[in-house]
């Protein structure tokens, strides 16, 4: 399984538990779009799936329609070359949280063998609630088989099943979201402050994270120093981008 840096660190145990191996494509730190040169080099005949996360945790990058079109073209070409399917797993918990009037393109529109994974916890500000859904592109020839298989897995993993009460509650607010304008205001404030202070940072297009480059080589040491100013920062070694750190802005602006 291939994924793109920076990535959510828990992908490692998710993939490891299946008996597969997660390999990380190095980041394009200029934009945090896909590094296609490195991706094509790593997309060998043993790759069964590619895991994407857009809008991205931790960078806040939103993959453009151009990026997703090129990704689909590469996957289609390589699947034909190797003579087997390559699945695209799209992790989409931040799908609605995009800024500047933009929208996150639906990844499944670009590639038939797409499995979309969604969580209500971000759009509804329900941190920690494990409630969402998995959707398979109807154009995927294995859609019915995958849905049935995932249903069996869901019943078997009891610790990750949402309560009936929460399922009923969420069903009543499917057309609602939190007020994302607060996140966008915080994004703008943080970005302006960081750039004014000389930090190197790509302006996030979504999520409630911002991902600056640390002012020293050891990002973990920098984050440790920041604690004395009541700043809880996350060094990005585990995200696949050493030398960077993640800040979250999902709090009151004040």
State what each model feature region is:
Residues 2-254:
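PLP-dependent class I/II
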